[in-house]
């Protein structure tokens, strides 16, 4: 559970910005999206390998450029 206390003389905008940052760092939304539907372990592994391969290719292209 992410919670934020409002500091003295702090605007609501700044408080919301701090909340959003904590919310993102906690990974709440990412976890929710991952658990929205079931993915078989074999499919999950395949997706992770393909993502890893793409990430490696991009990193390799950046190094060569």
Curated annotation (Swiss-Prot):
Residues 48-57 have a biased composition (Basic residues). InterPro entries: Ribosomal_bS21 (IPR001911), Ribosomal_bS21_sf (IPR038380). Pfam families: Ribosomal_S21 (PF01165). GO terms for cellular component: ribonucleoprotein complex; ribosome. Keywords: Ribonucleoprotein, Ribosomal protein. One of its GO terms (biological process) is translation. Residues 45-65 are annotated as: Disordered. One of its GO terms (molecular function) is structural constituent of ribosome. Belongs to the bacterial ribosomal protein bS21 family. This is Small ribosomal subunit protein bS21.
